[in-house]
């Protein structure tokens, strides 16, 4: 057992077990979220959970108070040296502690890249300004050290399919970006570039990236964002759909996404059953189901060997009085 893993195991002992909990989340310290544990359901008016549900070793026993730290925040960090980045990371973690948080969800693969040493993905342009260029230190290792030294949990946040959000983000792609290595896996939606969710080899590669993270870093979990199918356009995966022989496009697409999420969950648990695997879907499950082909209710209900997620953290960016989004999980 590595020193990092021993340190993470010792710290995790302070959390305990429960299958359902509610907590606050925020993106750039704004917005709210409800955390739903596997096998449970909740609505905007949910009462505090009972202890009747079967315990889930991956979930804390108390509140899960988390913050999303996105690539937008990394753009404001100093990556010029390990010392400079560590100073910024220390300030970030101190700020999290000062407002009562206990978990940091750090975006480490925003564009098919890596803010860590990877054999699968190029270095993120956020580190040096150029995708593929080694910054000379490991930002994720620094983040983990600074978080754990303060008793904070750190989850690695991965965007599974997105490779480029526009022609300028990232500004240029490395030679070993999947756009260049496996162009047959890539689909374009507007100016964005994405892995095609209908191609199993592409999904397998994403899962390999998850395994690389949990095997090599003392993270406390893996967190997927809501970037699943990038469009409802039937042309996106028409060739794969025709070859599949499936009869219903929407159901088939949901199967593709669920297969990826399930495989990622299993890769996390294969490394350590106490690690968390969660997804942050859109706050409206109807949109998840019909627009991004993410059957989040089924994921939440699945248990045992069929488990898909430990938790969902819906992106609920509205108040209880906003009736257009008053839907329940």
Regions found by a protein language model. Give the residues of each.
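Active-site-adjacent "subsite" loops/lids of carbohydrate-active enzymes
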Residues: 62-64, 68-83, 161-212
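Glycine-rich, aromatic-flanked loop segments that form ligand/cofactor-binding clefts
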Residues: 66, 101-109, 139-186, 223
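Aromatic- and acidic-residue-enriched segments that line the glycan-binding/catalytic groove
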Residues: 116-128, 162-189, 227-245
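Aromatic-lined carbohydrate-recognition surfaces of secreted/lumenal glycan-active proteins
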Residues: 155-159, 223-226, 253-290
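Substrate-binding cleft/loops of secretory-pathway carbohydrate-active enzymes
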Residues: 276-313, 318-321
């Amino acid at each position: 057992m590595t020193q990092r893993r021993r340190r993470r195991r010792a710290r995790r002992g302070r959390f305990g077990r429960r299958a359902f909990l509610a907590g606050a989340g925020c993106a750039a310290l704004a917005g709210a979220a409800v955390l739903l544990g596997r096998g449970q359901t909740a609505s905007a008016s949910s009462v505090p959970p009972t202890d009747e549900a079967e315990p889930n070793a991956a979930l804390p026993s108390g509140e899960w108070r988390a913050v999303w730290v996105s690539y937008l925040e990394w753009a404001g960090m100093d990556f010029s040296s390990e010392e400079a980045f560590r100073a910024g990371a220390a300030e970030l973690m101190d700020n999290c502690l000062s407002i009562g948080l206990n978990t940091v969800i750090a975006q480490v693969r925003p564009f098919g890249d890596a803010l860590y040493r990877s054999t699968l993905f190029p270095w993120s342009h956020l580190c040096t300004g150029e995708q593929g260029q080694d910054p000379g230190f490991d930002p994720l290792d620094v983040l983990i050290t600074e978080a754990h030294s303060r008793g904070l949990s750190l989850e690695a946040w991965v965007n599974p399919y997105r490779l480029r959000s526009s022609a300028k983000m990232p500004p240029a792609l490395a030679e070993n970006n999947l756009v260049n290595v496996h162009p047959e896996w890539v689909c374009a939606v507007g100016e964005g570039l994405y892995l095609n969710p209908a191609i199993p080899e592409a999904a397998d590669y994403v899962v390999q990236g998850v395994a690389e993270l949990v095997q090599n870093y003392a993270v406390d979990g893996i967190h997927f964002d809501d970037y699943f199918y990038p469009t409802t356009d039937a042309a996106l995966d028409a060739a794969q759909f025709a070859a599949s022989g499936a009869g219903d496009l929407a159901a088939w697409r949901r199967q593709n996404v669920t297969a990826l999420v399930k495989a990622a969950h299993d890769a996390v648990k294969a490394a350590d059953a106490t690690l968390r695997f969660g997804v942050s879907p859109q706050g409206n499950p109807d949109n998840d189901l019909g627009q991004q082909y993410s059957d989040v209710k089924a994921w939440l209900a699945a248990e045992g060997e069929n488990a898909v997620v430990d938790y969902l953290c819906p992106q609920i960016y509205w108040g209880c009085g906003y009736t257009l989004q008053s839907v329940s999980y």
